[in-house]
Structures are given as C-alpha cells and as structure tokens.
C-alpha cells in the first residue's frame, strides 16, 4: 500500500489540466481535423489471425453485430460470405467446405462459391437470384481482413489495411494473441492509449516512460493522409517521469511493483525481461515513446530513435464485433534474443488483461448510458464533458475523444438494438472468462491445455502406481507416501493442473486484492 501511495503522490505532483495546455502542446494539421468525414464502411477490418482458423473449414466471425462465414484456404485466397443462406437464412458457418471449394449449407445443401454465386441447390437449377452475399477479404501480415462496405458501393481497392513494417523484417520476431473482450470498442481504444493506468491497474511502473509530466510534455499530432483516414499520435521523452521527481522512491516502485507483473515466478521473470527490453529504463539513448492510433482498428506503441527505428513495438488491432464487444488482437514485434512460445505469452497476457478488463466493464454501463441519452436527444456524446481529464498524459485522449464523438454515432448497427447500450455490468466470472474469450478461439492454447491435462493424468496415475507398489512392499501407507518418486510425480501433476487453470477464469476478488496491496 505504501508503494501505491508513493505513486499517487508523485503523479499528483505532475498532474495538470490538459484543457489549459492542450493548444500549446498539441500539433495538428493546418486546420482542425474534420472527423465527420470518417466512414466506417470504407475501411478493412481484421477479424482473426489466420493461424487461429482451421484450413478449408468454415468459421463464424462477427463485425458490427453482423455474422460472417469465412474460410481460410491456406496458400489460396480466403473467402467470406454473410453468414446466412438465402434459402431459409440458416447459418452457413454450420455447414462445410466441399471438395470443389464451395461453402455448403448444412440445412438443405445449397452451395456457394467465393463470389456468392449459388452453384447447387440439390433439387433445382442454380440461379443468380439465389446468391449469397460475398464480402471482399484478404490476408495481410497473418491477419484475415474483411471489407464490409462493398455492398454499399465502397471500393475495396481504394484503401489498404494498415501494415506494420517491422513485421515484414526477418530480423524481428513476432508473437500474436487474441481475446474476445466484453468491452466496447471506444473504451478499449482509450484504455490502450492511456499509459497512466499501467501504474495502478497493472502495477507496471516501467511503462511510466509513456506518461507525460510538466517537465516532459506530451505532443499530440493528427495527420489525414487522405480524406477520412487519420493517424492520431502522441510522443513524449522515453524517460521515467517518477525518477525525475524522486529517484529513490521511483526505483522502489519499479522494483517493488513491476516485479508482480505475473503470479508465476517463471512467467514473471520472462515477462520482466521482456518489459525491461521494451521500456529500456536503463538505456541512455535519446528515445521517444510514441503511440499511434490509426482508426478504425490499429494502435502501435514503441520507443523510437530520431530516425524512427525501434527495437520493439507492441501493435494492437481492435475489431468492433458489436455494441459492448471487441475482438482484441495484438502482436509483440521486436528484435528479441529468443522466441517466446505463443501459449506462454498468452498466460502472461491473460493475467495482464484480467487486471483491468473488469474495471472497464464497470465503467461501460455509465458511458453507454450517457451515449444512449445523447442519441435520444439527437446529439453525440461529448467525452470531454463526460470525463474529468486531469493528467498531462490525457492530451491524446482528449483528441481521440473528439474522433469518437464524431464517429461512434455513425457506427453500423450501433442503435439497431438500443437495449444493448443499457446492459448492466456482468459479474467478473463473465467479464474475465478466459476460456470463452481466449482458449476456445486459440488452437495453441487449446493444444497446451490438452497436453497439460494428459500430463496431469499420467503423472497422478504414475504417482498412485508407485505409492501402491511401495505399500505392497512395505506394508505402510505413510512410508509409501514419503516416496520421492511418488511425491515428484504428484507435484508434476499439480503443476500441470495449475497450468490448466491459467486458461479459465482465475482472477477473482481475492487475487485482485493481492495485486492492490
């Protein structure tokens, strides 16, 4: 608790009202950006990592509360259709891919090619009037992207998915993750672009280099390379702001708080090494901590030198699956000395996400209620009036809030079911259900869980067999139980059991309270 009070005191010393300094510290285009030009339907959206999709099998994905049936064709072009058969509106994602490469509905066998053309109706001749709705799709940097605006006359060739140059560099290693969060898209964007919350929600003090202070102000820039396409960026000197106020206390915070980044010692050491590599507190280089939001989906954060180069970048893709729901996809891209197994990264990241996901879920009903009330009154929600911004780090949130004020009310299907905006906060067992949100959609994690369950079964069975054999020989249960082999096998089984628990709900109130100490 002392460490948390120290952080609060140090932050209080650096807080300032961003509304009084925003103009001086913000650089924009020659005139204020017109966010009303943003068109949700004129962009590509990432819906899944291709490695998480089975090859030549149908899978359902969701975007703007609309379901799509997608097929990962491996080395061939993917295909995507709206997830309803024109015959009787059954879900195509419940069907299969035929040997001819057609999506076949499981209800009556109607089959469709990648263009949506009906190729077979089994009992009648195919007709252009019986087509399914095809959606342009493509694979870029391991992500499957959809372009939902083609049916509304938008041109998928006029815009391209945003790319991460480092992901194309063979010198960089990349580890990806996915989680379906019960958090609204706008809230998640604000959360990722808010470095201050790392000090409290995550106890990750090294991330303080992304925060701002009076001595190290945050610069916000807005670019519009083409009409309706924006890049909103923040930049600040990549130095520990706490250390500039009180070196001794700041270092105590760094060593005391950030080292509780994960609950498992082995994971904690690996993640601390990665976090230190990412933040580089000990580095003497003159670096800039930069975060860039490219609406609608991409956020990139990293330390960059004067030439714009980085050793590590964290990139996020947020797919707005629906009101109050977002598919969170991320990639750590860096010149790392080693590759981290994907399932191990997921253990650490799930622990990390659990620390603030329920906090966002408690915030969500109030924000969506305010949006609902504003929509009823025929006006957009004004976040600068709803929130009480006070930190110099929140200057980028002020700017992003302006974008959200203009863009969110135009989100497809946003108000189709108004009651979704009025949903209460679910219990933490729901908001932090790792199995439903992550394990079910990640084959690497499912494989790790399957292997751990097998190891648990074999270890405990072997431990029981060894103990039973010693009982038969020694005639003493107590002496048999003391067998080093039996104890070792039992411990191995327990470790496997604990590992399985990492992929289901585990962040209860008791664990939260331990993190807050």
Predicted regions and their residues:
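Generic N-terminal initiation segments characterized by hydrophobic and/or small/turn-forming residues
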Residues: 7-8, 12, 60, 178, ...
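C-terminal catalytic domain of Rieske-type non-heme iron oxygenases
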Residues: 33, 77, 153-517
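A generic helix-loop boundary/linker signal
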Residues: 1-3, 14, 37, 55, ...
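N-terminal mitochondrial targeting presequence
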Residues: 1-23
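Rieske [2Fe-2S] iron-sulfur-binding domain
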Residues: 15-23, 27, 32-38, 46-173, ...
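A short, structural micro-pattern
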Residues: 41, 131, 138-140, 310-312, ...
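Short beta-strand or tight-loop elements
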Residues: 43-45, 66, 133, 218, ...
């Amino acid at each position: 608790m002392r460490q948390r009070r120290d952080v609060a005191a140090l932050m209080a010393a650096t807080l300032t009202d961003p509304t009084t300094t925003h103009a001086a510290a913000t650089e924009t285009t020659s005139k204020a950006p017109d966010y009303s030009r943003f068109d949700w339907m004129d962009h590509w959206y990432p819906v899944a990592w291709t490695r998480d999709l089975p090859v030549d099998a149908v899978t359902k994905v969701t975007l703007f509360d609309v379901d799509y049936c997608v097929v990962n064709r491996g080395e061939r072009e993917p295909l995507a259709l709206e997830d309803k058969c024109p015959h009787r509106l059954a879900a195509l994602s419940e069907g299969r891919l035929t040997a001819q490469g057609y999506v076949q509905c499981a209800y009556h066998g109607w089959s469709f090619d990648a263009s949506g053309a009906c190729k077979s109706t089994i009992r009648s001749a195919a007709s252009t009037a019986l087509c399914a709705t095809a959606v342009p799709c493509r694979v870029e940097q391991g992500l499957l992207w959809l372009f939902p605006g083609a049916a509304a006359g938008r041109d998928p060739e006029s815009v391209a998915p945003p790319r991460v140059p480092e992901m194309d560099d063979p010198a960089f290693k990349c580890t990806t993750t996915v989680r379906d969060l019960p958090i609204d898209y706008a809230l998640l964007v604000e959360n990722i672009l808010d470095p201050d919350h790392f000090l409290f929600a995550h106890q990750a003090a090294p991330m303080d280099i992304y925060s701002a202070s009076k001595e190290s102000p945050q610069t916000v820039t807005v670019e519009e390379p083409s009409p309706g396409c924006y890049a909103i960026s923040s930049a600040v000197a990549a130095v520990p702001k706490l250390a500039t106020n009180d070196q001794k206390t700041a270092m105590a915070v760094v060593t005391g708080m950030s080292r509780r980044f994960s609950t498992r010692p082995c994971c904690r050491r690996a993640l601390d090494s990665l976090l230190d590599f990412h933040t580089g507190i000990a580095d003497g280089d003159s670096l800039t901590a930069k975060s860039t939001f490219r609406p609608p989906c991409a956020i990139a954060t990293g330390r960059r030198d004067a030439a714009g180069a980085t050793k590590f970048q964290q990139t996020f893709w947020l797919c707005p699956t629906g009101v109050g729901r977002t598919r969170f996809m991320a990639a750590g891209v860096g010149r790392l000395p080693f590759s981290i197994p994907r399932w191990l990264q997921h253990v650490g990241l799930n622990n990390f996400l659990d620390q603030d996901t329920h906090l966002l879920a408690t915030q969500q009903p109030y924000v969506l209620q305010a949006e609902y009330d504003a929509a009823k009154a025929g006006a957009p929600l004004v976040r600068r009036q709803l929130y009480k911004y006070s930190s110099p780090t929140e200057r980028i949130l002020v700017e992003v809030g302006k974008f959200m004020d203009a863009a969110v009310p135009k989100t497809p299907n946003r108000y189709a079911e108004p009651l979704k905006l009025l949903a209460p906060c679910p219990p933490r067992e729901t908001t932090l259900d790792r199995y439903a949100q992550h394990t079910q959609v990640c084959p690497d994690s499912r494989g790790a869980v399957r292997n751990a369950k097998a190891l648990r079964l074999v270890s405990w069975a072997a431990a029981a067999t060894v103990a039973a054999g010693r009982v038969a020989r020694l005639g003493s249960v107590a002496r048999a139980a003391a067998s080093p082999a039996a104890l070792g096998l039992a411990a191995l089984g327990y470790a496997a059991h604990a590992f399985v628990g990492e992929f289901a709900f585990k962040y209860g109130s008791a664990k939260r309270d331990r993190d807050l100490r």
